[in-house]
């Protein structure tokens, strides 16, 4: 297993923070309001409404997970990028697939629970197929052992997608294929991260996959919690299915 620690520099940080203060406050309040609504129907409504401004808002947060995950996949994938079929789980508006497309990958299937997000993903023209699915409630609507790469970015966290979905990601991946996952490292997500890493290690002990790399990133995104400031950390995990 390879473990890397990344300390990412943010260009023109001070000047941009001053310029974005009002926007950041608005985005922070929006996200905190979503965390308060635990009911599934409320969350769906939130994401459907947020979809139109999602990309602008996460840019204010310096949300870098989609790029970091795409770079991780592109660095270790040694096959034919144009022929590789990628399953983008919790795809949102398509940020991860957009980065992967710029890196030479061409074939994408997207899954998300929000029809509003899927509508915008559809407009990108990136995806050959898009499916609606409530992860953790519905079974992932894909055939087993069908994808060269499976990615899930931003949704493996407390109050979002349950840890058990990780086994479905493995099932969707071809033997020899890759699964790329991310999670946040802030205090509110520590219990979830511990549970997630326990599941990942258990599957490694079961010989289902092997660890390719785990990248700890110090500056993942700007903190929104009232008891945190600056940036929170995050982690990119890349595993290769063995059977």
Residue ranges of model-derived segments:
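Class I S-adenosyl-L-methionine
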Residues: 205-243
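Residues lining the SAM
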Residues: 152-153, 182
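A short acidic, Gly/Pro-enriched loop at the edge of an enzyme's catalytic core
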Residues: 139-150
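A short glycine-rich, Lys/Arg-flanked "PGG" loop and its adjoining helix->strand segment in the class I
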Residues: 163-175
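Conserved class I S-adenosyl-L-methionine
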Residues: 178-206
């Amino acid at each position: 297993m390879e473990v890397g620690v990344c300390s990412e520099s943010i260009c023109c940080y001070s000047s941009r923070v001053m310029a974005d203060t009002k926007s950041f406050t608005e985005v922070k309040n929006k996200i905190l309001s979503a965390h308060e609504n635990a009911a599934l129907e409320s969350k769906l409504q939130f994401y459907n409404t947020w979809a139109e401004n999602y990309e602008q808002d996460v840019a204010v947060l310096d949300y870098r997970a989609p790029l970091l995950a795409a770079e991780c996949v592109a660095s270790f994938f040694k096959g034919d990028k144009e022929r590789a079929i990628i399953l983008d789980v919790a795809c949102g508006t398509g940020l991860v697939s957009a980065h992967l497309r710029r890196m030479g990958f061409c074939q994408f299937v997207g899954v998300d629970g929000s029809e509003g997000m899927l509508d915008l993903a559809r407009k990108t023209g990136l995806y050959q197929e898009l499916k609606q699915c409530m992860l953790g409630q519905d079974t992932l609507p894909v055939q087993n052992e069908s994808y060269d790469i499976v990615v899930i970015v931003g949704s493996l966290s407390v109050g979002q997608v349950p840890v058990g979905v990780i086994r479905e990601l493995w099932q969707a991946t071809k033997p020899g294929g890759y699964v790329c996952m991310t999670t946040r490292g802030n205090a509110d997500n520590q219990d979830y991260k511990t549970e997630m890493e326990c599941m990942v290690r258990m599957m490694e002990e079961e010989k289902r996959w092997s660890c390719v790399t785990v990248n700890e990133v110090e500056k993942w995104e700007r903190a929104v919690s009232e008891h945190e400031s600056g940036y929170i950390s995050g982690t990119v995990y890349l595993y290769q299915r063995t059977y």
